[in-house]
Amino acid sequence: MKDLFLFSSLLDASHTFSYFFHIGLVALIAVIVAMMATRSMQLVPRGMQNLGEAFLEGVLSMGRDTMGSEKGARKYLPLVATLGIIVFFSNIIGIIPGFHSPTASLNLTLSLAIIVFVYYHFEGIRAQGFVKYFAHFMGPIKLLAPLMFPIEIVSHLSRVVSLSFRLFGNIKGDDLFLMVILALVPYIAPLPAYVLLTFMAFLQAFIFMILTYVYLAGATVVEEGH
């Protein structure tokens, strides 16, 4: 990213400042959008309220399909929707010249993945109890428990790697792709690339949200006979 101009470099050229500058900018944009959507609530939604309600209803529908219940979907809606908003705006801001995607840094993606990892284990223990929750890690066959338990531990730890590196790799790749396109064919020619990158920003936010719901469902939904 050395050859790419960033507005943040006008204040401080360091990578650390750029990272926190864009994180703060994403948070500010999210707050402004939320305020615009809730500023004058109406029975028949219009404008930003309509967009906000459509987004939340979409996330809630995803949660119902994943969790298997309206109650579970609504319980975790604030977390999942907030993660989706942060990931989406962090992705999309990088396609604007002069700005950089915070999700192109492993610092943010790993932090978000750890939040999901810690929270779904916390919810699983709270829903099932400490002993019963970790008993699931040993599998239904007691003789195989010494083998299954470490495999399950590695499997859960790999979710942190999967969540963080998938998002980081895709957005970092998108940034590099855009930089190459702009260098080779500037002006009007990169417009199709912008459409593709906008779609990818939506897609990565969607994947992060649905995986969060999947992990929460796996931790909190008690299976019969297991």
From Swiss-Prot:
Keyword Heme (UniProt): no
A Pfam family recorded for this sequence: ATP-synt_A
Keywords associated with the record: ATP synthesis, Cell inner membrane, Cell membrane, CF(0), Hydrogen ion transport, Ion transport, Membrane, Transmembrane, Transmembrane helix, Transport
Cellular compartments annotated: Cell inner membrane
Binding partners and assembly: F-type ATPases have 2 components, CF(1) - the catalytic core - and CF(0) - the membrane proton channel. CF(1) has five subunits: alpha(3), beta(3), gamma(1), delta(1), epsilon(1). CF(0) has three main subunits: a(1), b(2) and c(9-12). The alpha and beta chains form an alternating ring which encloses part of the gamma chain. CF(1) is attached to CF(0) by a central stalk formed by the gamma and epsilon chains, while a peripheral stalk is formed by the delta and b chains.
Known role: Key component of the proton channel; it plays a direct role in the translocation of protons across the membrane.
Family (UniProt): Belongs to the ATPase A chain family.
Protein name, per record: ATP synthase subunit a
Species of the source: Campylobacter jejuni subsp. jejuni serotype O:23/36 (strain 81-176)
